[in-house]
Amino acid sequence: MNNQKKGVSRRDFLKIGSVGVAGLAGVAGLRAVAPATPTSAENRQTHGGDEHAAMTVGQVDHERNGFYPLELLYDFDYGTPGEEAGRAVREWNIVATDREIEIAPGLFFPGWVYGSPTSAASLRAGRIIGQVPGPTLRCVEGERLRVHFTNAGTHPHTLHFHGIHSAQMDGVPGVGRGMIDPGGTFTYEFEARPFGCHLYHCHAIPLKRHIHKGLYGAFIVDPDPERQEGAAQETARSRNHRYPENEAVNEMVIVMNAFDTNFDGENEVYAANTIAFGYVNEPIQVRRDQLQRLYLINMTEFDPINSLHIHGNFFDYYDHGTTLEPTLRTVDTVMQCQAQRGIVEFSFGGFEPGLYMFHAHQSEFAELGWMSFFEVID
């Protein structure tokens, strides 16, 4: 990168095209504005900052990105399930690559990304699409997992899973296989435990750079109902994708993330699933008579915490998703440090249809992209 050039500052992000936060009431108007002039996060010369509350106008080219905000919510990558000697086995192929991601209209971020041939984006394209966040890998407690990793990028990378596994499978420098050099491959193998809402990310050095560039994704381990009894077994069935009780729940994944577009160690863009204001331009439709289950993960670099606040409603929260009973009941805001995660459950039963806002309750984060809407429908 040319050291004489800087990326996009807060001021420039807002210059790409903006309206005041008061304009949130006119959501429909945001969907019909002219696209912004393309801006590279590595070659636009800027300086200064502006904390003015604003949001972008225009549209991100999701087709160019190869993935869509609404698709990221619902795409669970189950890999290739099988059986060996009577035991359930599940395998994935994960590839790390370098690519640009459009994170706001006309604003491109030079990312390092994970892709999988069994993600919705890759299946649709007929080739592996690298995405941020990476594919949501989903399995069942007790399964034997094999993750075949290929580093097709230009820097050493790893896969580090949050869960229980041996030191040899930890995916950290200097232990086991350690960092995987460009062109290298390695298979991570371990048992899926404990059940819960987990994550994976690159653990190569420098760690903050590899995470900030986009090498992370959700890792969900469904509980095995056969290991539970009574009411807990029924709850486990509703959290396990193989059971009909799970089909009655609307499940979503949001990874809270952010982007330092001028590489000064501070974020200029914040988002839910990478695209600034992605769920303002396309609100998330939810049926008011259906239980909503949100797998929420914070992978924001450079800021100590991120948060979720839902307007006009309250939710139950399961920290790390490793319990079948809520760890917090009837709250409307929760905060997470980096890599903290949990399950948010709520319903709009009895509510009138309409747009219900949700966002980070750090006001700056909301003003710079981490703002969204649920659209409650009958």
Per-range role (PLM):
Residues 18, 22-157, 165-167, 177, ...:
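N-terminal, post-signal-peptide metal-ligating segments of extracellular/periplasmic oxidoreductases
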Residues 1-12, 16-23, 27:
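N-terminal secretory signal peptides
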Residues 146-157, 164-230, 333-378:
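Extracellular/periplasmic metallocenter environments
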Residues 42-70, 81-84, 212-257, 338, ...:
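Extracytoplasmic/periplasmic copper-protein system
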Residues 120-125, 232-239, 343:
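Surface-exposed intrinsically disordered loops and tails
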Residues 253, 257-263, 271-315:
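Surface-exposed interaction/gating patches
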Residues 167-171, 313-324:
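Short aromatic-acidic-glycine turn motif
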Residues 84-88, 140, 180-181, 193, ...:
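Extracellular/periplasmic catalytic domains that process cell-envelope and extracellular macromolecules
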